[in-house]
Amino acid sequence: MNVRAAAANVLYLVVDKGHSLSSALPAAQQTVRPRDHALLQEICYGALRYLPRLEMIANQLMDKPLKGKQRVFHHLILVGIYQLSFMRIPAHAAVGETVEGTKELKGPRLRGLINAVLRNYQRNQEELDQMAVSNNAGKYGHPSWLLKLLQDAYPQQWESIVDANNQKAPMWLRVNHQHHTRDEYLALLKNENIDSTPHTEAMDAIKLAAPCDVMKLPGFDKGWVSVQDAAAQLSINYLKPQDGELILDCCAAPGGKTAHILERTSGSEVVAIDCDDTRLKRVHENLKRLNLQAKVVCGDARNPQEWWQGEQFDRILLDAPCSATGVIRRHPDIKWLRRADDIAALAELQSEIFDAMWTQLKPGGTMVYATCSITPQENVEQVKAFLARTADAQLLDSDPDQPGRQILPGEEDMDGFYYAVLTKTRA
């Protein structure tokens, strides 16, 4: 399939139909040549990063909007504008290939319109680009509700957060400690001429200077290494799992943190629970590649009595469902799929899971509450409320007035993440 047509289809599914990019893009990649996978991904990710700017330009160039069945051609225009504005593809190729996309999208009558719009943009690009950043949505590439939330929560840092959200995320690796030390794996990468640097805090994390195909990584197929952001790897620093313990990874899919616990312990029994059976397949796949064993359970974390009849856990990692506002650079569709009222609904869900999971923790046990969100309502305020209503909960390693640690996007080149460590006091 024509790459530009495939990209337009992805944007249509995400923006108009509410599909996630993580589901729409892999399906579209199956329709294009393998050598075009990276190009398709770049166009889709980039167009979603700068969607308001592209929309403003497209609307300025058209007399009337494309509606109904023609909406996919509106997104084809966005694909063309993105290439001309942000990519190093020669203009004639960007326009020509985008116009060719009308054939496979079954819209040959719109060929002339799309060609005219893109040529018009070429002629007036400087003026149109200036117009497109004249308001905050176009300038910062975020919906107004999210921009206001960030400005209110982080008055000194919101611009750096927004900038980080619009950058390409680096590729972080997690070395499997059961096979190699991090220094040993750094040497293996050096032997393959893959430039990399270790993280200062996440003990198994390595950042690649440039992303690469995982099959080019030494021993990837043997389970020597996994791909995981350094911020997510810090869960092990806070959980501090010990050999021989009974440990629960709650809301575990796709299983990176489950695997990390197993890689760092010996003789532990790890239970991984998630309510999404489809996503749990990823947990099984990851554990199989890494040759690790865990008890994988499909169940609702709010009702542990339905899926767990065993003893209480020594440690629980509660990686709560959240707005994912800390990982926008990896999932730019989040900006357009989330709504302002989602935050309160997610906070309520987190609260219910928090309370239910606390009953499963042994006295003297440790719970790490974690999200990949940066909203106070899901993080600091959530933990404060839990501590206020839970008599046997004690916060560790942080100030009760500002509980936990909030990592912001781009900090040490990491994703945005939140961690709070609590212990259950003994009677």
From Swiss-Prot:
PANTHER family: NOL1_NOP2_SUN FAMILY PROTEIN _ ANTITERMINATION NUSB DOMAIN-CONTAINING PROTEIN, NOP2 YEAST -RELATED NOL1/NOP2/FMU SUN DOMAIN-CONTAINING
Organism this protein belongs to: Vibrio parahaemolyticus serotype O3:K6 (strain RIMD 2210633)
Keyword field: Cytoplasm, Methyltransferase, Ribosome biogenesis, RNA-binding, rRNA processing, S-adenosyl-L-methionine, Transferase
Name assigned to this protein: Ribosomal RNA small subunit methyltransferase B
Locations listed in the record: Cytoplasm
Function: Specifically methylates the cytosine at position 967 (m5C967) of 16S rRNA.
Pfam entry (one): RsmF-B_ferredox
Cellular component GO terms held in the UniProt record: cytosol
Record NCBIfam families: PRK10901.1 (NF008149), PRK14902.1 (NF011494), rsmB (TIGR00563)
GO MF annotations in UniProt: RNA binding; rRNA (cytosine-C5-)-methyltransferase activity
Catalytic activities: cytidine(967) in 16S rRNA + S-adenosyl-L-methionine = 5-methylcytidine(967) in 16S rRNA + S-adenosyl-L-homocysteine + H(+)
GO biological process: regulation of DNA-templated transcription; rRNA base methylation
Catalytic residues (positions): C372
Record-stated family: Belongs to the class I-like SAM-binding methyltransferase superfamily. RsmB/NOP family.
Residues annotated as binding S-adenosyl-L-methionine: C251, A252, A253, P254, G255, G256, K257, D274, D300, D319
EC number in record: 2.1.1.176
First-level EC class: transferase
Gene it is expressed from: rsmB
